[in-house]
Structure formats: C-alpha cells, structure tokens
C-alpha cells in the first residue's frame, strides 16, 4: 500500500466533506455569520472525543490547514472580527 497516496486521498475526501457541509449549512452561507473552526470540525464528525493530551479542543487545530486551503482556492472566507468561517 502506498500510504502517502492513501493519506492524500483521505485529506481530499475530508476537504470535500467540510466544503459540502459548509455549502449546505445555512449558518455558513455567504451572508451568514459563519461558524468557528471547532464547530465545523465537530459537525463533520471529525472529533475523536476526549483523551489524555489529545482533548477535543486540541484535535480541531489540524482543520486550520484545510480551511486555509479552501480559502486559497477562493471557496471560503474568514471574518476578521468574529474569526468565523463561511462560504465566499
């Protein structure tokens, strides 16, 4: 098995899941308030629960790169003041 290819495939699938969720969530609409990254993370089922040194709050930080990639593609935007994410 090529683990790098499989990892890339999984990242792309999760990126698609997050974008699909945001596209279909009224709270993340272009003119809506948006959601914090932790809320998006949990609503997409990506939270593994609470573990020592891996709390739910710590786990959600990896989604930052995913949201920044969607932002670089012109698909989402982050409100500067509220720090919430929404569809662009």
Go through each PLM region and give its residues.
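Short alpha-helical segments that sit at the start of domains
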Residues: 1-34
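A short acidic, leucine-rich amphipathic alpha-helix
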Residues: 39-41
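Short, hydrophobic-biased segments on the C-terminal half of alpha helices
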Residues: 64-68
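A short, conserved structural fragment
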Residues: 71-80
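Short, cationic-aromatic polyanion-contact patches
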Residues: 81-88
């Amino acid at each position: 098995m090529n683990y790098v290819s499989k990892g890339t495939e999984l990242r792309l699938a999760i990126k698609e899941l997050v974008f699909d969720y945001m596209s279909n969530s009224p709270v993340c609409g272009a003119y809506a308030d948006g959601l914090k990254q932790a809320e998006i993370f949990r609503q997409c089922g990506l939270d593994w629960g609470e573990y020592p040194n891996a709390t739910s709050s710590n786990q959600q930080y990896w989604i930052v790169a995913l949201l920044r990639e969607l932002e670089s593609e012109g698909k989402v935007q982050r409100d500067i003041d509220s720090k919430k994410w929404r569809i662009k």
